[in-house]
A protein has these predicted regions:
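Histidine/lysine/aspartate-rich catalytic loop segments that bind and position anionic ligands
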Residues: 81-127
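Conserved N-terminal beta1-alpha1 strand-loop-helix module at the mouth
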Residues: 1-76, 93-94, 153-154, 173-190
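Glycine-rich phosphate-binding active-site loops on the catalytic face of alpha/beta enzymes
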Residues: 77-87, 120-129, 162-186
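Short secondary-structure capping/turn micro-motifs that flank functional sites
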Residues: 37-39, 65, 86-87, 106-108, ...
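Glycine-enriched alpha-helix->loop->beta-strand junction motifs that scaffold or abut catalytic
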Residues: 23-28, 50-53, 72-78, 92-99, ...
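Glycine-rich beta-to-alpha transition loops that act as phosphate-gripper elements at the mouths
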Residues: 1-7, 58-64, 80-83, 100-105, ...
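Catalytic cores of alpha/beta
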Residues: 63-73, 106-115, 131, 137, ...
Length: 190
């Protein structure tokens, strides 16, 4: 997940260059934190042009107005940091995949009852690597889960090994220092 500094063209260009490196290394899914900023759509379009193999999504979607941007840019999916049934329902009505964020057993149960087969455990680092499996005994079969929030490249093997279906990395994997070399190595091996 990337969160571009849309008021800083140099920062955006550096980020695009880093995304090209990740694209070439084989990264397949990328989320760009949604913003109502006028430059957000243009930034996403630039990624679509220079990295056509990315399945692009929007992260941090908490407003229904974001759904218009998702639709006009033909984004593959969106992720929310929280469980908002009205937002998930509105996305469904538009034929869009919005992955809700969950943390508590109640949220996991509610999203499952709502028909969500894919959820984002957020913030995952707060609850630890064993948390998700502990929910299985009281709740039964759990949905496909993407662990996100506070995780780094060092966490990849442990979290995937503990049964999380996917990991979303954020600012620590890419930033002013460049792309984390551990991530590039991991992508090149997979």
């Amino acid at each position: 997940m990337v969160r571009p500094q849309l008021d800083d063209p140099l920062s955006c260009q550096r980020l695009l260059d880093q995304l090209k490196d990740l694209h070439e290394a084989g990264l397949r899914h990328l989320e760009v934190a949604w913003s109502s900023h006028a430059g957000w759509r243009r930034f996403v379009q630039e990624i679509q042009e220079c990295c056509p193999r990315f399945a692009l999504g929007a992260a941090s979607v908490v407003a229904i107005e974001a759904l218009d941007d998702l639709q006009s840019l033909d984004l593959a999916y969106a992720m929310a940091p929280c469980w908002d049934p009205a937002l998930v329902g509105a996305a469904r009505d538009l034929g869009q995949l919005l992955i809700p964020g969950v943390l508590s057993p109640t949220e996991v149960q509610q999203t499952t009852a709502f028909g969500c087969r894919l959820v984002k455990l957020f913030p995952a680092a707060t609850v630890g690597v064993a948390y998700w499996k502990r929910l299985e005994a009281p709740l039964g079969p759990l949905p496909f889960v993407i662990a996100a929030g506070g995780l780094t490249t060092i966490d990849l093997s442990a979290w995937l090994g503990a049964g999380h279906d996917a990991i979303a990395l954020g600012r620590r994997a890419i930033g002013d220092h460049g792309v984390d070399p551990v991530l590039l190595g991991w992508l090149n091996r997979s």
